[in-house]
UniProtKB/Swiss-Prot annotation:
Domain of life: Eukaryota
InterPro entries: Acyl_CoA_acyltransferase, GNAT_dom
Alphabetized GO MF terms: acyltransferase activity, transferring groups other than amino-acyl groups
Organism per entry: Dictyostelium discoideum (Social amoeba)
Protein name: Uncharacterized protein DDB_G0283377
Composition skew (Polar residues), residue ranges: 382-391
SUPFAM superfamilies hit by this protein: Acyl-CoA N-acyltransferases (Nat)
Annotated stretches, region: Disordered: 121-146, 371-392
Ranges of compositional bias, category Low complexity: 121-143
């Protein structure tokens, strides 16, 4: 009967689309109820379907905390069930959803309010006291189900005595990174196992046998501990955050963390990335290579794999980062664009001034003067970058007026385009100075 009511809701456009499929386990049988629809329109907290029930009790949650229970008598399939009470008109979604795509749950787990035995409200005028007691027992049994075994592979879930308290979905057609939808508060072990699965999903073995992956669980990933030590050997206080401070910033969700390892799990290079939503870009705040192997080309291989990983997300179109003057020629060889934008500068007591530059890597193709030139980091000779000849970086880079005012139209395979020039990158630089200064406090 629950399936009948839910189908009726679909027929009346309570769910506006069918791109979302949700499966709920019947606590009285092995049958499953599939709820199709748009999660932005309606959230279903419980639905029961069993031959032993005379009624189908469906609890619908709308708005912030309003919960409405709707019980309908069994009816033939051809019965007129198109009339739904006006008070069940959906207004907003209120389902507990933990988005782990960036290691930022959105809300602290301790603050998540999850369904309990008291969350299903039944009308006394319709449902007998015996049915209320029976339903409470069913919910208690369902919550007592043990699920010690967790996800065992990228594509499936293995449970112990029953269903897991959450299901795995994939967020978009472009992303293979899984997300988690929770109906009960998961244990810390389940969260750790899931985040490890997410990291494994990003794992890529390069042609040289190195392993590139993204870290989602800083406190329980040995790769992060190694990356933190590598950061400490490359960036120093007081101009940069200390290791403990950086660790705190990662736990806050400020950074995405990428590493490259050998086959024994030794981290050889790492990067800390910030997503700049306002400008459709990523900002690479820190990149480090393990001391002792610098200068051997490993940094370039890591940078290439990093930009490939970000480009495949088809989420943002450019990656920006600051660079010390002496490193600018290396970044230009990596197909970076130098648009003469100073991201920061410092003047020492002796009067000497050093500049930091905001360089750009297009994560897509550039349309320039009617041409379609790919500007990936694997391009041997970038068509849009200035000469790699090292100029005098004690002063701003001298470019022609055409280069200074040059605009770039960038697009990726998803069809999204973005136009930027020196002025746009200068706006990003000013934004980052303010944003990162506040975020690192």
């Amino acid at each position: 009967m629950a399936a009948l009511i839910l189908r009726t809701l679909l027929d009346n456009n309570v769910f506006s689309s069918s791109d979302y499929i949700h499966t709920i386990k019947d606590p009285l049988s092995t049958s499953m109820v599939e709820v199709s629809g748009n999660p932005q329109s309606c959230g279903v907290s419980e639905a029961f379907s069993s031959p032993s029930l005379k009624k189908a009790d469906v609890s619908l949650t709308f708005g912030s905390s309003q919960e409405i229970s709707y019980a309908a008598m069994s009816a033939p399939l051809n019965a007129d069930t198109s009339r739904i009470p006006d008070e069940i008109a959906p207004t907003d979604v209120n389902k507990t959803e933990l988005d782990l795509s960036t290691n930022n749950f959105g809300v602290p787990l301790a603050d998540v309010v999850l369904p309990s035995s008291s969350s299903t409200t039944l009308s006394p005028s319709i449902v007998s006291e015996q049915q209320q007691q029976q339903q409470q027992q069913q919910q208690q049994q369902q919550q007592a189900i043990s699920s010690e075994e967790i996800i065992t592979s990228k594509g499936g879930i293995k449970s112990g005595a029953g269903e897991l308290p959450f299901s795995i979905v994939y967020g978009s057609a472009f992303s293979k990174t899984p997300e988690i939808v929770s109906f009960q508060q998961p244990t810390q072990k389940q969260i750790n196992d899931f985040l490890q699965m997410k990291s494994d999903a990003t794992r890529v073995v390069t042609s040289d046998g190195y392993i590139f992956r993204e870290i989602f669980n800083p406190d329980h990933d040995d790769g992060f501990k190694q990356a933190l030590e590598m950061y400490g050997s490359s960036f120093f206080e007081p101009t940069e955050p200390g290791k403990n401070h950086l660790h705190t910033l990662c736990n806050r969700g400020l950074y995405r963390m990428m590493v490259m390892e050998d086959d024994k799990g030794l981290v050889l290079a790492c990067a800390f990335i910030v997503e700049v939503h306002a400008y459709k870009s990523y900002h690479m705040d820190y990149l480090a290579v393990r001391p002792g192997i610098r200068g051997g080309g490993l940094g370039g291989k890591f940078f290439k794999q990093l930009t490939t990983h970000l480009r495949n997300e088809q989420k943002y179109l450019i990656i920006t980062f600051e660079s010390e003057p002496k490193l600018v020629p290396w970044y230009l060889r990596m197909s970076c664009l130098h648009l003469n934008v100073v991201s920061d500068q410092v003047t020492y007591e002796n009067g000497e001034t050093f500049f930091w530059w905001l360089l750009v890597v297009p994560l897509g193709k550039i349309i320039d003067d009617g041409s379609d030139a790919d500007t990936d980091s694997d391009s041997e000779h970038p068509t849009s970058a200035p000469s790699t000849t090292a100029p005098n970086y004690a002063l701003p880079l001298s470019l022609t007026e055409k280069q200074r005012n040059r605009s770039y139209i960038l697009y990726n395979e998803s069809g999204v385009s973005y136009e930027f020039n020196q002025q746009t990158i200068n706006e990003i630089a000013q934004y980052l100075l303010t944003f990162m200064s506040d975020a690192k406090k």
